[in-house]
Design a protein with these regions (language model features):
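N-terminal capping/interface segment
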Residues: 62-83, 211-212
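Glycine-rich hexapeptide-repeat left-handed beta-helix
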Residues: 26-27, 121-123, 128-230
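Glycine-rich beta-solenoid repeat tracts in large extracellular/virion proteins
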Residues: 79-80, 97-98, 115-117, 132-134, ...
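ABC ATPase A-loop
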Residues: 67, 85, 103, 179, ...
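Terminal amphipathic alpha-helical/low-complexity segments used for targeting or macromolecular assembly
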Residues: 1-65, 201, 207, 216-218, ...
Length: 230
């Protein structure tokens, strides 16, 4: 069914196809790899390096390896562990739980009871209500509806593959949530299974169970009903 990919690059799931890198402080990291998931093991060290280079006139250091822009709003009940960077004009709302290795961009919303772990969140992203985002990258202006989550470990604990209609990429990774391209909309209470990659400008129906690759400019109704936007 699938073409096993070894040295051949699958263009549609590359960083260049999914993201506008001018909309993230992680641009140098993402430019150093081909596929977005290849950046996941490097997020922690990148944040520490970047954080130590930030202008202290703009970013306040709150605890070990935690840098928060002075224009950002962090509610008292939020928990933030380092390493972490919170960008300009971002809101971290009540009871948000940031477990570390989180690079959150400008003008973002990390909402009520949302949990982040080992993530790159581009500018203008909203994860506003009861979301779990782990070992994932969310592109510019993407939005996850209430209760939608990225599942980052398979139930049988085997290594994650990224699969499309005609390709199968072995990532060699046990923990891999989802890669959302720019302007992706995920409907409420959807589950993005390990290894999900959603192309830019695509919409996911509420209550969806998504796995594998969803092409850009698509509407995902269910696994067997993915239509192109017109």
């Amino acid at each position: 069914r699938y073409k096993k990919m070894n040295n051949e690059t699958v263009k549609q799931v590359t960083i260049k196809e999914l993201y506008d890198l001018t909309e993230t402080a992680a641009k140098p990291l993402l430019e150093s790899v081909t596929y977005p998931w290849e950046a996941l093991p490097k997020i922690k060290d990148f944040i520490i390096e970047l954080g130590n280079s930030l202008d202290p006139e703009e970013y306040e250091k709150r605890g070990e390896n935690i840098w928060i822009h002075k224009s950002a709003t962090v509610f008292d009940s939020a928990y933030i562990a380092g390493p972490c960077i919170i960008g300009k004009d971002t809101e971290v709302r009540q009871c948000a739980f940031i477990r570390g290795s989180a690079l959150v961009g400008d003008n973002c919303v990390v909402g009520n009871s949302t949990e982040l772990k080992n993530v790159i969140i581009f500018n203008n992203v909203q994860v506003p209500h009861y979301n779990y985002v782990g070992d994932s990258i969310l592109g510019f202006h993407s939005h996850m509806g209430a209760g939608s989550i990225t599942s980052n470990v398979k139930s049988d604990k085997t290594l994650v593959h990224v699969k499309g209609a005609d390709f199968d990429i072995a990532t060699g990774m046990k923990k891999f949530g989802a890669m959302l391209g720019d302007y992706v909309e995920v409907g409420c209470n959807s589950v993005l299974n390990p290894g999900t990659v959603i192309g830019s400008h695509s919409n996911i129906y509420p209550l969806s169970r998504v796995r594998g690759y969803v092409p850009s400019n698509s509407i995902y109704k269910d696994q067997n009903d993915i239509v192109t936007k017109h």
